[in-house]
Structure formats: structure tokens, C-alpha cells
């Protein structure tokens, strides 16, 4: 059986958040900044064939199960999957307070 492939789409907000994180990290170490961003992207891509790979987002109010989240290198990544799309919604450092959504 062939597994369905989902398309990953980064929202403008999540693109800006990962870019901001990268720019902050590269001030200390360019190689670490590159590694962290690559690891986050690789981790997101693990959900391409199974969007339920990561657990439900525990901070999402009234989560129907389509909002998922995971942590990588002290960053929390939130995405939502629908029919054929995995939409990355947020990338934030775990020291930041989560905003209700």
C-alpha cells in the first residue's frame, strides 16, 4: 500500500519566526544556527507520510486532533494537517509563553 504524501506549507508567520531564530543563533554560531534550522525542517518532514507522527498540541483549545506539536532544540513547532497539507503555524522558543489559539 502506498502512503499518501502531504505537502508541507510554511505560513509567512512561521517562516518569519524561524528566520528570526536563525538570525539570533548565528550571532553566536553560524554552524549551530544552520544545524538547528536543518533539524527542525527534517523533523517537520517526518510528518509528510504520517501527519499524526507527533502528538496533539496540548496548548490548543478545542483541538480536534489536527493540530500537532513537537519540540526540537528548545523550539516548539506547531502544525495543522488537513486533507493533503501540513501547514506549519508556529516556531517559538520553549522559554516563551504560549499564546492561546
Sequence positions of predicted segments:
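Basic, Lys/Arg-enriched alpha-helical interface segments
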Residues: 1-64, 101
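Basic/aromatic recognition patch in beta-strand/loop cores that engages polyanionic ligands
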Residues: 53-84
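Enriched for short, Lys/Arg-rich terminal
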Residues: 1, 72-76, 80-101
Amino acid at each position: 500500500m502506498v502512503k499518501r504524501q502531504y505537502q508541507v506549507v510554511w505560513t509567512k508567520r512561521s517562516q518569519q519566526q524561524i528566520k528570526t531564530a536563525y538570525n539570533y543563533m548565528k550571532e553566536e554560531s553560524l554552524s549551530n544556527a544552520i544545524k538547528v534550522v536543518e533539524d527542525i525542517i527534517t523533523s517537520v518532514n517526518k510528518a509528510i507520510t504520517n501527519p499524526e507522527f507527533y502528538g496533539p498540541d496540548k496548548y490548543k483549545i478545542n483541538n480536534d486532533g489536527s493540530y500537532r506539536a513537537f519540540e526540537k532544540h528548545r523550539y516548539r513547532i506547531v502544525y495543522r494537517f488537513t486533507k493533503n497539507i501540513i501547514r506549519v503555524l508556529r516556531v517559538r522558543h520553549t522559554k516563551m509563553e504560549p499564546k492561546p489559539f
